[in-house]
């Protein structure tokens, strides 16, 4: 709930609201539609944030402060109106103002589409960090692409995922402030010409194709301060339309350039199962990087008039490898546009960039074919080649001319450019996103690089914009916490630790259980309205919501459900604690096996739904089109948080933190941030199962043969055979074969441990006071996972912001 103090902004809003309705729509507040109210209210908030941002950045520049630029292909922003109103502490005032006109603020929120400019945790993390940077008062700007459609809308047709365009701009454009005067020309293809002049070697890029990048700014509010971040989103278009060619009848040729340019900012992550898709993704990456770096350099020059101090005033952060081409692009500007020597340019670059790695899986480390890069961005390719040549030469000299080690560390090998290796070579800091992940990076993924430059490697455990997931999304829990420990936790997540002293207070525990029940009832109403599915709120809400990928092991969850289902079919009258398994996930459009797993979850849910003897005890629900808004409704209602990736595969996770914050108990492996969640809440308040990372590596080294487990474990055998025989009339041979014959993420090896953990967590749940105590300790321990804490660590230890 919002604070009760008077907010000086409210007088201005009360005055502007009816005026803007009259000016834009010629209606009074009483006559206005909810959609008109949404647009006017949003525009007022944008104006407030814009003024705060200008004041904030003017102060930074006048003080000579350093700024961070956060480059990411994804920013999963969700809705802005509610978050901005809460962060500006205007919720009570605006709600009361609208009530005078008989307008319901909660209904107004529903008119805003999710800004789905991301796919999952990577994009949501970036969004949380812009919030955290604004809250903590660090000057920051994010850079990404203004995707016309963003991530797809998911629709299940007979359980099969289909992808529909996510047309977010009509409702979301009110949050975008166009800056056409800051447009930048981006050059693709073309030829390189080399020449010498007065003993200087010059390279000129000619005969290129131009795409114009136009920026749109989205303001990101922080809580309770003067800071405002900006997310600068770049839209692509052709520089002009060739009317002469069109009038001569060459329609296809005249339109082709427009089509190629427009495709760049059309959708997030186009399918890259074919060459055209790969080419488009590469164009997207360079487009974003060239626009961002060009804009950063221009802005810096406007303030300081020189690039000599760029690294002292600018930190550029690469969030995963998609923005890697920003490194050679800054080199290009320094060399070609500004005339720096290679050595001086490289010194500036290597003091400016920092890199966060988000994966330890070799297949997920981004690589690009050299011929594709050479064709699409020839000047950038030539710079990468020179970076690699000089880097390898320095490695040879440093490592006693160990050619094998140099080959392993080379940026270019096997006709591929290894983007993560380029990031490590060019960045002054390389960090993982959990303690385990950062250790794995040093031990295996970048072991040679770590030995070469150990001082570069750091850890910053992920954090979340916790106010969004608690203060904004869970008012009932916020009210209880405020009454129990005071309201300081809304500003400072560390204050949540004060709840720990109430772990044996039956009155507080009883109230906590009542809050959870209330939230489950509210979520059930939401699901009924959205999907016409009726949830049993007296059951355990067991939740696995995240991107659909084999390493996240949704199919391990499914295996256990199949085992429970088989047991209940044979023992329909047996005692069984009712449980509702809730899934929500999107699969990449070209990821066939992931789509099969989604269909299998749907098939199980349908078969159980049709069985009246079982469906009161066991329920499976797949919620379509997982997004930030759905997550905000679900997190407060969750009992069990499934974090079941194979140890050593999940970098960190952030859904685990949001669920923990709302009192869900983690059922998980010792992977990613689960280890730190365990440390924060206490061993007795989390349920851990499965192999550790060393045990996984040992089993791989010995030789893992899943078919042996299949042949010798009756429950596993039956579950996989059920996939072959059919569920709700559908067979899942590909999923079954993958588990039985390959099982790359060791589902079968961890199954017995997982099933025992499921039984134990059910026993804990049935002891109501014990469960409430476990829940309370999770909430009390969640403060460490605040984005405010994470960005402060980045600012102090990596970006060196004041």
Residue ranges and their predicted role:
Residues 1-802:
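A conserved ligand/cofactor-binding region detector
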């Amino acid at each position: 709930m919002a604070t009760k103090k008077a907010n000086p902004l409210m007088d201005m809003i009360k005055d502007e609201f009816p005026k803007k309705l009259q000016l834009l729509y010629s209606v009074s507040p009483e006559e206005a539609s909810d959609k008109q109210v949404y647009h006017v209210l949003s525009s007022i908030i944008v104006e407030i944030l814009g003024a705060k941002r200008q004041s904030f950045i003017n102060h930074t520049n006048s003080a000579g402060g350093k700024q961070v630029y956060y480059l990411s292909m994804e920013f999963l922003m969700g809705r802005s109106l509610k978050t901005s109103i809460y962060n500006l502490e205007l919720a009570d005032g605006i709600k009361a103002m609208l009530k005078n006109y008989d307008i319901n603020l909660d209904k107004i929120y529903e008119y805003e589409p999710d800004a789905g400019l991301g796919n999952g945790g990577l994009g949501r993390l970036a969004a949380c960090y812009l919030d955290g940077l604004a809250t903590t008062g660090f000057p920051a700007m994010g850079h990404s692409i203004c995707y016309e459609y963003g991530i797809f809308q998911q629709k299940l047709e007979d359980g099969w995922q289909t992808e529909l365009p996510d047309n977010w701009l009509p409702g979301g454009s009110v949050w975008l402030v166009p800056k056409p005067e800051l447009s930048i020309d981006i050059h693709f293809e073309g030829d390189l010409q080399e020449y010498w002049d007065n003993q200087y070697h010059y390279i000129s890029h000619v005969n290129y194709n131009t795409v114009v990048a136009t920026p749109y700014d989205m303001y990101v509010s922080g809580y309770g301060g003067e800071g405002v971040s900006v997310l600068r989103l770049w839209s692509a278009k052709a520089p002009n339309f060739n009317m002469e060619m069109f009038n001569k009848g060459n329609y296809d040729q005249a339109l082709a350039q427009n089509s190629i340019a427009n495709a760049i900012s059309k959708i997030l992550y186009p399918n890259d199962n074919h060459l055209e898709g790969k080419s488009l993704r590469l164009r997207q990456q360079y487009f974003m990087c060239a626009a961002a770096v060009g804009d950063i350099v221009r802005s810096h020059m406007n303030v300081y008039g020189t690039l000599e101090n760029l690294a002292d005033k600018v930190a550029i952060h690469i969030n995963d490898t998609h923005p890697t081409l920003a490194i050679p692009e800054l080199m290009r500007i320094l060399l070609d546009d500004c005339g720096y020597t290679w050595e001086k340019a490289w010194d500036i670059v290597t003091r400016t960039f920092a890199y966060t790695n988000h994966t330890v899986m070799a297949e997920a480390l981004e690589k690009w074919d050299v011929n594709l890069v050479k064709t699409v961005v020839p000047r950038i390719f030539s710079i990468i080649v020179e970076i690699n040549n000089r880097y390898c030469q320095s490695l040879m000299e440093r490592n006693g001319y160990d050619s094998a080690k140099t080959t392993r560390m080379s940026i270019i090998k096997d006709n591929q450019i290894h983007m993560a290796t380029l990031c490590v070579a060019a960045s002054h800091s390389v960090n993982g996103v959990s303690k385990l992940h950062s250790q794995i990076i040093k031990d295996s993924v970048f072991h040679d690089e770590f030995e070469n430059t150990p001082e570069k490697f750091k850890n910053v455990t992920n954090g979340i914009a916790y106010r969004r997931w608690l203060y904004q999304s869970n008012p009932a829990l916020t009210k209880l916490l405020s009454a129990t420990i005071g309201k300081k936790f809304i500003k400072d997540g560390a204050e949540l630790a004060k709840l720990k002293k109430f772990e044996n207070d039956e009155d507080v525990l009883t109230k906590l259980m009542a809050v959870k029940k209330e939230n489950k009832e509210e979520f059930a109403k939401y699901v009924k309205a959205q999907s016409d599915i009726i949830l049993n709120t007296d059951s355990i809400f067991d939740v696995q919501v995240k991107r659909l990928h084999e390493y996240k092991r949704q199919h391990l969850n499914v295996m256990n459900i199949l085992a429970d289902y088989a047991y209940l079919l044979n023992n329909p009258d047996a005692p069984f604690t009712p449980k509702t398994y809730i899934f929500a996930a999107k699969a990449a459009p070209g990821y066939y096996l992931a789509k099969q797993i989604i269909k299998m979850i749907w098939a199980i849910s349908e078969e159980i739904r049709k069985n009246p003897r079982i469906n009161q005890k066991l329920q499976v629900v797949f919620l379509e089109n997982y997004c930030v808004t759905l997550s905000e409704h679900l997190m407060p209602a969750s009992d069990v948080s499934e974090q079941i990736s194979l140890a050593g595969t999940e970098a960190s996770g952030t859904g685990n933190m949001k669920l923990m914050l709302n009192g869900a108990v983690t059922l998980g492996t010792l992977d990613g941030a689960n280890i730190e969640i365990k440390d924060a809440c206490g061993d007795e308040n989390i349920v851990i199962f499965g192999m550790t990372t060393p045990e996984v590596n040992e089993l791989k080294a010995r030789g893992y043969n899943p078919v042996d487990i299949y042949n010798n474990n009756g429950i596993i055998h039956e579950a996989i055979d059920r996939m072959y025989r059919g569920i709700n009339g559908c067979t899942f041979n590909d999923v079954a074969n993958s588990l039985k014959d390959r099982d790359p993420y060791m589902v079968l090896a961890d199954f017995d441990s997982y099933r025992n953990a499921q039984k134990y967590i059910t026993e804990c749940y049935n002891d109501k006071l014990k469960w409430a105590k476990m829940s309370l300790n999770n909430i009390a321990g969640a403060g460490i996972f605040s984005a405010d804490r994470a960005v402060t660590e980045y600012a102090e230890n990596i970006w060196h912001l004041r």
